[in-house]
A protein has these predicted regions:
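Active-site rim/adjacent substrate-binding subdomains
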Residues: 1-143, 148-191
Length: 191
C-alpha cells in the first residue's frame, strides 16, 4: 500500500465529472487500499478518486457512529438518493453541527446544509453490490464524497457569507490552479 498525494482545489480532475469504473481487477483493489491508507493518515472520513488524481467514480469512507458502529467501505459507481434538506432561508445553519471540511481544501471548515438522510447503492472493489440507508453524519459523508464524483467541491455549495470566506481562504493559500497537492504524513494540511 502507498500514501497518495491529495489534490487541492483548482486541479482539473476535481472539477470535472468522473467516469464509470469498468474494470474490477487487482489494480482497482490496490487503488482502494491506497485510498484507505491515505484517508486514514490524512485523517479523513472519506476520500474520492478525483481527490487522488483518479477521475473514476469511486470513494472510500470510514466513520464510527454514536453507537460505536464502524462504517467503512468502498463505493464504486455509486448512486445516491437524498431526502429534502431544510433551506437556509428557513432555518439558520448551525456552525457546530453542520460544519464540514474537505481534504482538497485543507484546513478550512464551513457550515453547509446537507440532507439528513441518504440511500447509497454501489458495488465494492470486488464488484459486489450493496445498499446503505444513512442518516446524520454518515449521510453527510456520502453526499460530500458523491459530490466529488460530479466535479463539485463542498466550497462550491457554500452560501453567503461562507462562500466569500472560502474564496478568500483559497486565494490567501494561493490555491485554485492545477498542480497543487499535499501528502498525508509528510505535509501539514494547514500550512
Amino acid at each position: 500500500m502507498a500514501v497518495l498525494p491529495i489534490r487541492i482545489t483548482g486541479e482539473p480532475v476535481l472539477h470535472a465529472p468522473a467516469t464509470e469504473v469498468t474494470v474490477f481487477d487487482d489494480d482497482l483493489r490496490t487503488l482502494v487500499a491506497d485510498m484507505f491508507e491515505t484517508m486514514d493518515l490524512a485523517p479523513g472520513v472519506g476520500l474520492a478518486g478525483p481527490q487522488v488524481g483518479v477521475g473514476q467514480r469511486l470513494f472510500v469512507y470510514s466513520w464510527t457512529d454514536d453507537d460505536g458502529v464502524l462504517w467503512r467501505g468502498a463505493a464504486v459507481n455509486p448512486v445516491l438518493w437524498t431526502t429534502p434538506a431544510v433551506p437556509e432561508s428557513i432555518e439558520e445553519l448551525d456552525e457546530d453541527d453542520e460544519s464540514e471540511g474537505c481534504l482538497s481544501v485543507p484546513g478550512e471548515r464551513f457550515p453547509l446544509r446537507r440532507s439528513e438522510g441518504a440511500l447509497l447503492r454501489a458495488v465494492d472493489e470486488h464488484g459486489e453490490p450493496f445498499e446503505i440507508e444513512a442518516h446524520g453524519w454518515l449521510a453527510r459523508v456520502f453526499q460530500h464524497e458523491y459530490d466529488h464524483l460530479d466535479g463539485v467541491l463542498y466550497a462550491d455549495r457554500l452560501v453567503h457569507p461562507y462562500a466569500k470566506q472560502v474564496q478568500k481562504a483559497i486565494r490567501k493559500a494561493s490555491w485554485g490552479g492545477p498542480g497543487q497537492s499535499w501528502l498525508p504524513g509528510r505535509d501539514h494540511p494547514e500550512g
